[in-house]
Every structure is written in C-alpha cells, then in structure tokens.
Amino acid sequence: SGHPVYTNGDGSQGMLHTGMGATGWGAFAANAYNRSSGVGSVALGFHTMAGKPDVDQNGITGDNIGQFSVGWSVRATGNRAFASGHRTVASGSDAVAMGNWSYATGDSTISLGKENWAEGASTVAIGFKNHAAGGGSVALGQENVSWGTTNFTSGYQNVAGDTSAGVGTAGSATAMGYRTVASGRSSMSANKYTNAINQASTSLGLGTTADNFGMLAVGVNNAAGIGDTTIDPDNYGGYYYSDGQYTGSNPGV
C-alpha cells in the first residue's frame, strides 16, 4: 500500500501466507523464513515466497508451478513467475520482477529497477517509478506513464495515453523526452514540453502543441490546429479548421 506507483491498495502484495517451508510438490526452500508452495517451486534468501500464498500444492498441476524467488521479502506468486531483489512482486503468470519494490502484476510482464509497475498484460517497465498500464505498453526511464494499450514512453516524466479516462485509453501513442504528453490515439510527442493531444497528431520541439486531428507542430512554442481541446481524443470522428473556422468535417474531407 506504500508503493509510489502501485495504486490498487488492496493489500494483495503483502507477505501473509499459510505457512513457511517447502510445502508444494517437489518444492525446495533454503535459508530462512521462506515458503515454496508451488509445484517444483524454489524459494531462497530471507522471507521470500514462491507459489500461491494460500495454497500448498500437494499434487502436480499446471496452474501453480515453477515459481522462483530469491532475495529479501520478494514474492513470485504467479504461475511460472520469477522474483528477485527486495520487495519485488511477480504475481502475473510468466511475470518477471527484479530490483527494489518493482511489481509485475500482469501476465507475461517484466518490471526491472526500482518502484516500477508493469500492470497490463505483456507490459514492460524498466528504470525508476515507471508505470506500464495498458496491455502491451512499455515505459522506460524515470517516472513515465504508458497508460493506453501498446503505448511507449522513454525519458523523464512523459505520459502516453489519456490518463483522465480508463486504463487502455488512447492506444498506440508515443511520448519521449522530458515532460511530453501524447494523449491522442496514435499520437506522438518528443523532445521537451510538447503535447500531442488529438488523434494521430505529432508534436516536436520545445513547448509545441498539436491538438487537431492528424496535425503536426514543430519548433518552439508553436501550435497546430488550436481549437476545441475538450473533444474526445480517442474518437475517430475528428474535427478540422479552415482559415481559422471550424468546419465539422471528417478526416479526409
């Protein structure tokens, strides 16, 4: 619950379980205060967990098997999950968490470094305080958020996706550099303080804004398509301006 990025706050990432030792079929536990409850699971180090916290798998099964944990207070509770370091969590199936307080809670996720969260399925969060939320998204660097599906962020304090809506909104967006925002679907922002806030828009340079459908803003403090910024950036209806006047036309008209 004290994680700076993980927001579920449901206590599911704690160390409570039903007993220490090698309690699973063919499991192995060594060192001190460890629990290996999955089939063929391994728990090493100090106060680690490999396998489900509330199930002692006495028979061979394919849904609680092959977990590996090593370090201090790490949890590899997902099926075939791997966790190492300090206070890391690999709770998704085939998840990998390494480092310090990094969480990999989605299936087939990777969380490496410090205080990262790979939330959606097949996400990657590497660095410091990164959050890969939408399925298939990637967050690299420091304090980046990849909110939509298949989003990509790299650098420092960048945001891809529409964080004012549910996880997965404004997919396929890319934000790179320093404090850039790509909140429209299939949008891209790069460099510094740039904002691509509508569908398929691109913003590059310093402090530029691209808020119209498919528009490009480049340079310093330039804006392309200034207009109704409250329009849903995840809707393909779009809008266009001609000579400063709103036309209401669909893209391509």
Predicted stretch roles:
Residues 1-253:
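Periodic small-residue-enriched repeat registers in elongated scaffold domains
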